[in-house]
Amino acid sequence: MRNATSWSLYRRLLSYVRPYWKAFLAAVVGYAIYAASSTALAEMMKRLIDGIQNPDAAFRLMLPLFVIGMFAARGVGTFLGTYYMSDVARNVVHALRCEVFNHMLRLPGRFFDMHSSGHLLSRVTYHVEQVTGAATNAITIILREGLFVIGLVSYLLWTNWMLTLIFMAVTPLIGLVVNYTSKRFRRLSRRIQNSMGDVTHVASEALSGYRVVRTHGAEAYEKARFAEASDYNREQSMKVALTKAVSTPVIQLLVALSLAGLVWLAMSPALMASMTPGEFVAFITAASLMAKPVRQLTEVNSTIQKGLSASQELFGLLEQPPEVDEGSYVPARIDGRVRFEGVRFRYGEDQAEVLKGIDLDVPQGEMIAIVGRSGSGKSTLVSLMPRFYRPTEGRVLLDDVDIQEYALSPLRQRIALVSQQVTLFNTTIAANIAYGHPDADREAVESAARSAYAHEFIERLPNGYDTVVGDNGVMLSGGQRQRLAIARAIFKDAPLLVLDEATSALDTESERYIQQALERVCRGRTTFVIAHRLSTIERADRILVMEQGEIIESGTHGELLAQDGAYAALHQLQFQEAE
């Protein structure tokens, strides 16, 4: 979409208007009434001047009625145009915003790895609002003032076509100015939108990590980062303001020069003889009335280009390919047998392999613990099962069926994930436990909480299960948040459970509660546990030791200690640290 033309962007935006064509047509009719009634002001001046020279009783009666009718029609047209165009615009923006958000939910994990959340949020909020400006204010002005200009030009041609063509001689010059400023507005608008993403990103990081900022005394550093991002946005906005401030007076000057030449020519004896005083005044009035709509049409150009630039970014996002979901297999039930066959994986073609020929067979109901240094590929390995990523080579099988053959949603519904970075939503505890099931039975929610050893602390909260936990569970302790995450996994009742460093950042008491909860939730389920504390996985059926993307050791806790290899060294190191 980077090289998309203005017309192609307009055409795509208009496709969102199609479902609301009736309201759009009503708005066009309203603005046509407005333009016709406003143009009638020139005709009123003609009748007034000519009527003064030849007054009669009918003229005295008809002219006031003409004035009343003209302004009444103008009011009706303004109402119809403004209301129905706002209705169309807000519906278009709503549809576009929802489409962008819904598409984001379907994008693959690699996309989110390559884009900051601040820039993505900016597209849903700031970019869409720029389209709103183009879809409401800009289109309103284009239709209303554009039809007004068409009406005035038509009236001028009807009154004196020769003078009108002379008056229109400056149109090519105005077109050159508009063309230059349009390109500049689009370029600057793209920079402003990117800088707004930077502003959102810096603010989001600093505010969500305010504890780290304060404990490290980094307030001054974050202030400087934010000021730099905001100042760049200000600089680009001022360039837009400068372009707008120069272009509008230039266009007005061109119109004024044309109008001055028109008056000079119109006052020549030859033309004065061919026109009545009323026609002369009406012609000059119509030409003068054109200054305001032309000015508004040139000023709205910056808003249009901002909207086009924003829509270009949004359409580019919508063209990102969604997560691949070519599978169609939907099993009635899953036992939980997992097999990795020659699995290799790299995050990018120019990056080193993270997994190197993984072969692993896990029977139903077995608990597999995975240990190793940071960066050894543990989390990447378990991320392949819910298809957050696809293997570069090899395949992963669930119940002897390649997971690529499964329909994506049913596959993920049968996998429960609990990680160190718990995600809680700013809603009630009950809604967090039953996430994705708004009509869940309260007894089932409480049963899951009891199994996760969370019921006791929940009951002590002021509103119990109806307590709102705050942004990402800020009102709860780390252990409480972790127990809610486990309760969510228990409520899901999936046959396959993945625990990614679920207890690594907890105190001893919280870890004891969570260990008891995990022992309960793991029963009868195939479980993958990534652990930093080896004491938490001693009861695992099998322990895998990973190093640089390979499984270098496999066995029970006792077997691996007896081998006196990498696992024994890790165990000895942690034992010494504990002492």
Curated annotation (Swiss-Prot):
<dbReference type="GO" id="GO:0005886">
    <property type="term" value="C:plasma membrane"/>
</dbReference>
<feature type="domain" description="ABC transmembrane type-1">
    <location>
        <begin position="25"/>
        <end position="306"/>
    </location>
</feature>
<feature type="transmembrane region" description="Helical">
    <location>
        <begin position="61"/>
        <end position="81"/>
    </location>
</feature>
<dbReference type="GO" id="GO:0016887">
    <property type="term" value="F:ATP hydrolysis activity"/>
</dbReference>
<dbReference type="InterPro" id="IPR011917">
    <property type="entry name" value="ABC_transpr_lipidA"/>
</dbReference>
<dbReference type="Pfam" id="PF00005">
    <property type="entry name" value="ABC_tran"/>
</dbReference>
<comment type="subunit">
    <text>Homodimer.</text>
</comment>
<keyword id="KW-1278">Translocase</keyword>
<keyword id="KW-0472">Membrane</keyword>
<keyword id="KW-0813">Transport</keyword>
<dbReference type="GO" id="GO:0005524">
    <property type="term" value="F:ATP binding"/>
</dbReference>
<keyword id="KW-1003">Cell membrane</keyword>
<keyword id="KW-0067">ATP-binding</keyword>
<keyword id="KW-0812">Transmembrane</keyword>
<comment type="similarity">
    <text>Belongs to the ABC transporter superfamily. Lipid exporter (TC 3.A.1.106) family.</text>
</comment>
<dbReference type="InterPro" id="IPR027417">
    <property type="entry name" value="P-loop_NTPase"/>
</dbReference>
<feature type="transmembrane region" description="Helical">
    <location>
        <begin position="253"/>
        <end position="273"/>
    </location>
</feature>
<dbReference type="Pfam" id="PF00664">
    <property type="entry name" value="ABC_membrane"/>
</dbReference>
<dbReference type="GO" id="GO:0015421">
    <property type="term" value="F:ABC-type oligopeptide transporter activity"/>
</dbReference>
<keyword id="KW-0997">Cell inner membrane</keyword>
<feature type="transmembrane region" description="Helical">
    <location>
        <begin position="147"/>
        <end position="167"/>
    </location>
</feature>
<comment type="function">
    <text>Involved in lipopolysaccharide (LPS) biosynthesis. Translocates lipid A-core from the inner to the outer leaflet of the inner membrane. Transmembrane domains (TMD) form a pore in the inner membrane and the ATP-binding domain (NBD) is responsible for energy generation.</text>
</comment>
<dbReference type="InterPro" id="IPR036640">
    <property type="entry name" value="ABC1_TM_sf"/>
</dbReference>
<feature type="binding site">
    <location>
        <begin position="372"/>
        <end position="379"/>
    </location>
    <ligand>
        <name>ATP</name>
    </ligand>
</feature>
<keyword id="KW-1133">Transmembrane helix</keyword>
<feature type="transmembrane region" description="Helical">
    <location>
        <begin position="24"/>
        <end position="44"/>
    </location>
</feature>
<keyword id="KW-0445">Lipid transport</keyword>
<dbReference type="InterPro" id="IPR003439">
    <property type="entry name" value="ABC_transporter-like_ATP-bd"/>
</dbReference>
<dbReference type="InterPro" id="IPR003593">
    <property type="entry name" value="AAA+_ATPase"/>
</dbReference>
<dbReference type="GO" id="GO:0034040">
    <property type="term" value="F:ATPase-coupled lipid transmembrane transporter activity"/>
</dbReference>
<keyword id="KW-0547">Nucleotide-binding</keyword>
<dbReference type="InterPro" id="IPR039421">
    <property type="entry name" value="Type_1_exporter"/>
</dbReference>
<dbReference type="InterPro" id="IPR017871">
    <property type="entry name" value="ABC_transporter-like_CS"/>
</dbReference>
<dbReference type="InterPro" id="IPR011527">
    <property type="entry name" value="ABC1_TM_dom"/>
</dbReference>
<protein>
    <recommendedName>
        <fullName>ATP-dependent lipid A-core flippase</fullName>
        <ecNumber>7.5.2.6</ecNumber>
    </recommendedName>
</protein>
<feature type="domain" description="ABC transporter">
    <location>
        <begin position="338"/>
        <end position="573"/>
    </location>
</feature>
